[in-house]
């Protein structure tokens, strides 16, 4: 059977793209599958797609393409209703391309994936193909004018699917389509490669786009209610979007800086779910609830609002999580408290979540779709003379929906940190042949002084699908060669240039425990740290840390004109009575100010820095003041205060500290040429991990 999925833009990101790819890859084990994207705006899809699946685009909108500005591209679509969400993207030109594709397709089944495309599928797909509409949006969220057009055109369909049973009922009640079955089939989520969470790390995880419908404000407020009761717990929210600024302001307002972290986008997300012990979903509406299933497949119990329509069909309340009232901070806090206070309950519910989420495996969901197609074919054969249901030979089962990548550059590398200073690399690549490929680390210097490449001893294993599995381990001893820096993770053979590899899973959860040990018992020797991370272009990098001595920042508080810093000294020295915390103005007009240090023990310190001294001695409108610790008043040597030891790369973004306004002093060195105005002081962590603060005259 040949199955064709028609999608808006497979080259972008989004829940529909991800679920269509999951289903397509499961169907591709036994059938011929293609994904036809209306638009193409990038060289390659953001999500990895199995080479089994053919990917084509109808309209190429990349710079320089002939389709940009083509005849008819400025004229409105005659098929897509004006009220449809993506109406502005469509035109008479796109109408022509889509209709031509549907009339010429040789697919046995054509599946549309949003209302605009389903209208095309219903009205223009050739008669010999089954027409199926996937509805990923909650039915009543579709504008009434679009639903009216669906009611007019959808009777030509053979089947309609929604992602929940509740939405299937809503569809039938509000937009009945005589003679066309509406079936609830959930989205699928593959079993993660990452090991499930053991529910011991005191982290609440949430993930999704930063949009008001996700109601992260409720989650942050609920966590704030519990912050004093559970001082060692942390909230991590992953995602990008327009609400991030408001949420940062709320974190500051509630005094949760360093406790509630906005982590930004992260892919693949499975390794971040597995770091947590509780997943939280606080949306006001969810058409399905992919994040619930993703978290459950990683072994997390879920606290979710009982919002329409997905969560109540996914969660088994009291067994693998808690459903709490929609829109209520108190209910969310109640659910979180139940799990934060009871580790055995977390573990039991996490194990139940792992079992219960198996019903969303792509193979199981693909079987339901095949039954839907077969039932539709029987109905069509009974009603339409001359129609022949597809009955060609199926592909031989390969046991898995994956095949080797077409080239080494398309291969992703998974990395696991084991907590003992080792990183384990794994990549499933193309057939090895005579290449003798191996992992090689290439230095990416900040000063132009590049160090020699470091080849890693690499093992190779032939896979059943004809590909090759490459594995290597980087041990702590290698840091003597790597030193402090950033390294590209590449693969090369004796006869080929290095290829910078794509980042897959980065399972760094073991580093959470390592940081806790280091902060609790700072090392008396050098500090080492290996952290894999992905560049914005998706390529895999390694951040290596080798410091003979540094002060690791563990807490920052900003009060009325006072900055309070707490940290531990790592290295051979100890913090002596009379030690000083030093702030130093960067640049050619350097100046130092020192504050006394309070000793909490021989390696742990606390300092209170009066910010007025810095503000009143500024010389420029924008200044940076670096932080140092002088552990011994009789030894002039200072050591840098840093925030290096985390399990994620963007410390600066996650720990976004607020700005404190101070009024400039009329007698300051700077007020001679500028009148008194507010001066803002903000601590930050630089990209190198060094702590500093901005002093800005606005």
Question: Predicted regions span which residues?
Answer:
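N-terminal strand-loop element at the rim of the active site
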Residues: 7-13, 26, 30-86
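A conserved mid-protein helix/loop that constitutes part of the nucleotide-sugar donor-binding site
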Residues: 17-22, 202, 206-228, 242-249, ...
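Donor nucleotide-sugar binding/catalytic pocket of nucleotide-sugar-dependent glycosyltransferases
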Residues: 133, 140, 155-193
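Aromatic "clamp/platform" in nucleotide-sugar-dependent glycosyltransferases that forms part
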Residues: 265, 284
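Conserved acidic donor-binding segment of nucleotide-sugar-dependent glycosyltransferases
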Residues: 316-318, 322-329, 338-343
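A short, well-ordered alpha-helix in the C-terminal region of glycosyltransferases
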Residues: 331, 338, 345-359, 368-371
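Basic, ligand-binding patches in group-transfer machinery
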Residues: 382-698
């Amino acid at each position: 059977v040949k199955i064709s999925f028609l999608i808006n833009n497979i080259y972008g990101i989004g829940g529909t793209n991800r679920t269509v790819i999951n289903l397509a890859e499961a169907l591709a084990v036994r059938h011929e599958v293609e994904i036809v994207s209306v638009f193409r705006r990038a060289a390659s899809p953001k999500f990895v797609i199995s080479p089994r699946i053919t990917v084509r685009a109808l309209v190429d909108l990349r710079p320089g393409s002939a389709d940009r500005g083509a005849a008819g591209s400025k004229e409105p679509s005659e098929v897509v209703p004006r009220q449809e969400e993506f109406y502005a993207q469509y035109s008479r030109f796109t109408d022509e391309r889509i209709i031509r594709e549907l009339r010429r397709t040789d697919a046995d089944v054509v599946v549309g994936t949003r209302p605009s495309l389903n209208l095309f599928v219903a009205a223009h797909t050739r008669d010999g193909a089954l027409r199926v509409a996937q509805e990923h949006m909650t039915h009543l969220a579709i504008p009434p004018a679009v639903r009216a057009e669906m009611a007019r055109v959808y009777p030509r369909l053979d089947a309609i699917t929604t992602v929940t049973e509740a939405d299937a009922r809503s569809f039938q009640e509000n937009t009945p389509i005589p003679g066309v079955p509406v079936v609830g089939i959930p989205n699928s989520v593959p079993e993660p490669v990452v090991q499930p969470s053991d529910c011991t790390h005191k982290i609440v995880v949430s993930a999704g786009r930063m949009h008001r419908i996700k109601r992260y404000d409720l989650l942050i407020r609920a966590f704030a209610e519990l912050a004093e009761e559970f001082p060692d717990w942390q909230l991590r929210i992953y995602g990008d979007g327009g609400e991030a600024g408001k949420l940062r302001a709320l974190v500051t307002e509630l005094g949760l800086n360093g406790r509630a972290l906005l982590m930004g986008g992260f892919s693949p997300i499975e390794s971040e779910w597995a770091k947590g012990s509780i997943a939280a979903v606080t949306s006001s509406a969810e058409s399905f609830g992919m994040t619930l299933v993703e978290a459950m497949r990683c072994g997390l119990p879920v606290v979710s609002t009982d919002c329409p329509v997905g969560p109540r069909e996914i969660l088994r309340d009291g067994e693998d999580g808690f459903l709490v009232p929609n829109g209520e901070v108190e209910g969310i806090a109640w659910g979180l408290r139940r799990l934060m206070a009871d580790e055995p309950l977390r573990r039991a519910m996490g194990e139940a979540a792992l079992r219960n989420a198996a019903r969303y495996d792509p193979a199981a969901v693909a079987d339901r779709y095949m039954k839907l197609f077969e039932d539709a074919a029987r109905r069509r054969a009974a009603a339409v003379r001359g129609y022949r249901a597809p009955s060609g030979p199926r592909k031989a089962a390969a046991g898995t929906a994956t095949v080797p990548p077409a080239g080494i550059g398309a291969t992703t590398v998974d990395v696991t940190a084991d907590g003992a200073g080792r990183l384990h690399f794994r990549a499933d690549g193309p057939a090895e042949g005579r290449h003798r490929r191996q992992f090689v680390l290439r230095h990416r210097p900040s000063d132009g002084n590049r160090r020699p490449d470091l080849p890693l001893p690499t093992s190779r294993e032939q896979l059943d699908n004809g590909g090759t599995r490459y594995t290597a381990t980087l041990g702590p001893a290698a840091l003597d060669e790597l030193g402090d820096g950033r390294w590209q993770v590449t693969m090369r053979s004796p006869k080929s240039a290095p290829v910078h590899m794509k980042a897959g899973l980065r399972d760094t959860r073991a580093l959470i425990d390592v940081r806790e040990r280091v902060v609790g018992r700072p090392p008396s020797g050098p500090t080492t740290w290996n952290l894999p991370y992905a560049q914005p272009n998706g390529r895999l990098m390694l951040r290596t840390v080798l410091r003979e001595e540094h002060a690791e920042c563990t807490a920052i508080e900003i009060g009325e004109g006072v900055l309070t810093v707490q940290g531990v000294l790592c290295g051979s020295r100890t913090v002596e009575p009379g030690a000083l915390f030093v702030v130093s103005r960067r640049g050619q007009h350097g100046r130092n100010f020192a504050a006394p240090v309070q000793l909490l023990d021989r390696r742990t310190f606390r300092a209170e820095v009066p910010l007025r001294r810095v503000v009143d001695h500024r010389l420029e409108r924008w200044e940076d003041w670096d932080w140092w610790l002088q552990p011994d008043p009789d030894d002039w040597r200072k050591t840098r205060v840093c925030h290096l030891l985390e399990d994620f790369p963007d410390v600066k973004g996650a720990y976004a500290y607020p700005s404190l306004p101070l009024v400039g002093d009329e007698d300051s060195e700077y007020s001679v040429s500028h009148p008194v105005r507010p001066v803002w002081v903000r601590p930050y962590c630089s990209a190198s991990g060094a702590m500093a603060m901005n002093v800005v005259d606005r």
